[in-house]
């Protein structure tokens, strides 16, 4: 039985690593894979299972931090500066890197404030299968709209051409994504595209902006709930964290390599299919009714 539980921990870590930064909603996938199928709360207990999800989310966040480590060092004025994306040699000599710490802070403010105000309400009232399905579907439609608009934009901007207004608007959309299932990256990448960034630039800024917020939020949650971790469950937590970190590294790098080519519509279609599948399980078979 212990081996089976460890395998379940690895599976959940893999799912977290694949979905946390992809525009498909990690919350929706956790409901499907854990709450409807693996049910970690049955062998860990509800509080310990909640803490486990915090730990594997940290695995994904550390993966994103590693992928963007050079960017973060540059933003903090540590380390060597690379060429600015979207600028020629003359512009590079006359202009500093456009993306800086203030851009990130401006983008973080809306979600940070609303998170402090409404986090408990959202956790208590909005984490249910029907609300997550709504978030998945509405988010998919928003992504399709963004992709259709992006076709009309000539010479979309790179991440180093972003301005403070764009950063703030993208930050507001990150706050909207507090609705479970909407997807932080789906919302912010779509908004970035609507603000005339290219898909890769919108994705870069999304991940850079998300890392400090998620580190702070997950870190605070872990401080509140670390006492729920049982010594016997530590191998479960370690394997889940390592799985989320490793798979997260691969998923983030692959996503950033492909996003300018494939755009958002394939992810939107996948989300709609996922909604249909969850709806069949929930309304047709009653699976997840107690969530």
From Swiss-Prot:
It catalyses: di-trans,octa-cis-undecaprenyl diphosphate + H2O = di-trans,octa-cis-undecaprenyl phosphate + phosphate + H(+). It is found in: Cell membrane. The chain crosses the membrane at residues 1-21, 48-68, 102-122, 126-146, 162-182, 203-223, 231-251, 267-287. Its EC number is 3.6.1.27. It is a multi-pass membrane protein. Its main location: membrane. Catalyzes the dephosphorylation of undecaprenyl diphosphate (UPP). Confers resistance to bacitracin. Belongs to the UppP family. This is Undecaprenyl-diphosphatase. It comes from Staphylococcus aureus (strain bovine RF122 / ET3-1). The gene is uppP.
């Amino acid at each position: 039985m212990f081996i089976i539980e460890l395998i379940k921990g690895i599976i959940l870590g893999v799912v977290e690593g694949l979905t946390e930064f992809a525009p498909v909603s990690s919350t929706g996938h956790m409901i499907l894979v854990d709450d409807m199928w693996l049910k970690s709360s049955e062998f860990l207990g509800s509080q310990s299972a909640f803490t486990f999800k915090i730990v594997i989310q940290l695995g994904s966040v550390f993966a994103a931090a590693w992928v963007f480590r050079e960017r973060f060092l540059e933003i903090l004025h540590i380390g060597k500066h690379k060429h600015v994306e979207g600028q020629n040699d003359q512009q590079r000599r006359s202009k500093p890197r456009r993306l800086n710490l203030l851009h990130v802070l401006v983008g973080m403010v809306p979600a940070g404030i609303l998170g402090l105000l409404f986090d408990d309400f959202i956790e208590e009232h909005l984490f249910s299968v029907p609300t997550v399905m709504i978030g998945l579907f509405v988010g998919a439609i928003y992504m399709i709209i963004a992709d259709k608009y992006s076709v009309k934009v000539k010479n979309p901007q790179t991440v180093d051409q972003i301005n403070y207004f764009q950063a703030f608007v993208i930050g507001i959309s990150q706050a909207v994504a507090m609705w479970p299932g909407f997807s932080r990256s789906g919302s912010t990448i779509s908004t970035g595209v609507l603000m005339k960034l290219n898909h890769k630039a919108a994705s870069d800024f999304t991940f850079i902006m998300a890392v400090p917020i998620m580190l702070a939020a997950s870190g605070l949650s872990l401080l509140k709930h670390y006492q729920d971790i049982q010594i016997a469950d530590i191998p479960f937590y370690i394997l889940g964290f390592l799985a989320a970190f490793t798979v997260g590294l691969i998923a983030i790098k692959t996503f950033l390599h492909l996003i300018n080519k494939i755009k958002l519509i394939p992810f939107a279609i996948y989300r709609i299919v996922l909604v249909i599948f969850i709806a069949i399980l929930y309304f047709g078979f009653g699976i997840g009714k107690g969530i």
